[in-house]
């Protein structure tokens, strides 16, 4: 049978647990002793996990099944960017900085105020924490991201799965971690969410009629952010709320230089992203209040963290 942990299982930070790597859908639990085993594993009632191609038990039993063996991927997500964002969204808080997706979702809900709370969309949702947070307050929430790897994590969590991932400690050393909505108090409203892979600059027509659109740390990662901003009003109901958060870290790897919204000289004057937002959104939106800064921390290794301030602006659709 497949090998997995009990729901209450947790690794101890001090104990070097050698069982967690076997929770990967590649190990089978084999009952009985093994001729190469000593100690507890040699007992008749022992249980231990072995990869299917190991030959320790070749002389004991041979089982042939008519059921095709499905090829399984590792249950532990190891993609560096995905694991960083899993920890960013669902892991521990560092340096007394509150969880960013949760804090931003609460800010967005407050910005909507007494307006309709029917439908919301999180554009650039990554692995989905803000989507689940918004689902506590909206009847339907859609998370859209360009990366299928990110979306897969949100889909698995919404399904009720435990998503296991590793975080880098030092060199090749990693720590095994897991995320589950029930542990965060988010499972009761998970049925309200949907995840879609999509391009914020070229959204399908179905993504319309929202009371709230959240664009978190998105615009400075788009290949044509002005195109997105020119058309975003078409996705919102009249009177709907648009919340944009960004550290404005413009990089040519993500956005061609001629598509940057700000961070350069224009007509001899400093032109900032906020100036561009006001110019591009002014026809259909009114900015509510003043911009505010929301901090976030992304863990890279045990001793290396990114500490960033994201500027948050709130806009109401007026035309």
Q: Can you say where each PLM-predicted feature lies in the sequence?
A:
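A short acidic, Gly/Pro-enriched loop at the edge of an enzyme's catalytic core
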Residues: 201-213
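Surface-exposed recognition segments
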Residues: 1-68
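A short glycine-rich, Lys/Arg-flanked "PGG" loop and its adjoining helix->strand segment in the class I
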Residues: 226-238
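S-adenosyl-L-methionine
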Residues: 159-201
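Conserved SAM/SAH-binding beta-strand->alpha-helix loop
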Residues: 147
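Conserved Class I S-adenosyl-L-methionine
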Residues: 170, 255-290
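Conserved beta-strand signature within the Rossmann-like core of class I S-adenosyl-L-methionine
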Residues: 239-247
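Conserved alpha-helix/loop element of class I SAM-dependent methyltransferases that forms part
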Residues: 95-117
């Amino acid at each position: 049978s497949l090998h997995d942990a009990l729901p209450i299982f947790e690794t101890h930070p001090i104990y070097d647990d050698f069982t967690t790597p076997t929770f990967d859908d590649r190990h089978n639990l084999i009952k009985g002793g093994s001729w190469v085993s000593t100690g507890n594993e040699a007992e008749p009632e022992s249980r231990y996990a072995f990869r299917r191609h190991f030959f320790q038990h070749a002389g004991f039993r041979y089982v042939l099944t008519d059921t095709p063996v499905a090829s399984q991927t590792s249950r532990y997500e190891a993609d560096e960017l995905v694991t960083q964002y899993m920890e960013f969204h669902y892991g521990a808080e560092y340096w007394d900085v509150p969880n960013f997706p949760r804090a931003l979702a609460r800010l967005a809900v407050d910005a909507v105020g007494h307006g309709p709370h029917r439908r919301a969309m999180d554009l650039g949702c990554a692995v989905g924490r803000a989507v689940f947070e918004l689902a506590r307050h909206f009847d339907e929430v859609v998370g859209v991201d360009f990366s299928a790897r990110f979306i897969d994590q949100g889909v698995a969590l919404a399904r009720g799965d435990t998503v296991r991932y590793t975080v880098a400690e030092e060199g090749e050393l990693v720590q095994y971690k897991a995320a589950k909505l029930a542990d965060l108090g988010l499972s009761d409203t998970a049925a309200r969410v949907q995840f879609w892979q999509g391009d914020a600059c070229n959204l399908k027509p179905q993504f319309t009629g929202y009371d709230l659109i959240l664009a978190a740390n998105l615009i400075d990662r788009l290949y044509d952010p002005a195109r997105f901003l020119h058309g975003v009003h078409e996705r919102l109901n009249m009177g709907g709320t648009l919340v944009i958060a960004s550290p404005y870290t413009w990089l040519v790897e993500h956005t061609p230089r001629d598509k940057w919204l700000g961070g350069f000289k224009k007509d001899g004057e400093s032109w900032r992203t906020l100036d561009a937002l006001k110019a591009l959104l002014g026809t259909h939106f009114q900015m509510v209040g003043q911009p505010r800064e929301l901090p976030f921390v992304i863990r890279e290794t045990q001793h290396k963290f990114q500490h960033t301030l994201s500027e948050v602006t709130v806009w109401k659709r007026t035309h």
